[in-house]
Every structure is written in structure tokens, then in C-alpha cells.
């Protein structure tokens, strides 16, 4: 496990639920991608929802961020907070396969 001394980024991908304190709130997959690409500090965690509602037009649902991370070999720690059981299982299957 890598321990960072200093500032780290935690990303919260969700269209409705506000980010907890200390997280950067991204409402769409494309916003999350831009946030990751421009991060100036190490990314400690990405906490994902699956269903992004009105923001799905901007990059798809949360699983699309996992697709992009795997394609770009960016294997940050992932946590899921989605309430969609099918979406959660699909995301977990992807995490088990690539992470």
C-alpha cells in the first residue's frame, strides 16, 4: 500500500448526491475524466455511482469511467456507492477482472 504524505485527491462521481467533505464532486463521466487528467496531486480514491441520470449524456453511466480507467491502465482504488444492484454487479465484475 502506498502512503502519501501531503495532499491527495478523492473523486466522487454522482449526479445527485453531494460529495462528502474532502472529495471533488464530478457529476458526469467526462467531468471525472478531465479531473483525473488534470489532477496535480495523487488520486487516493474514486467513489462511483452507476446511474448518472441527466448527466449520462456526458460520457455515459459510471461503468464507462471504469472502462476508460482500464483502457488507460489507471488502476486507482475504487469504491462503489450505487444503489443499482445490476449496475453494482457489473462494475464489481469489471473491478475484479482488471484491478
Range-by-range predicted roles:
Residues 1-99:
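Catalytic phosphate/metal-binding cores of nucleic-acid and nucleotide-processing enzymes, i.e., regions
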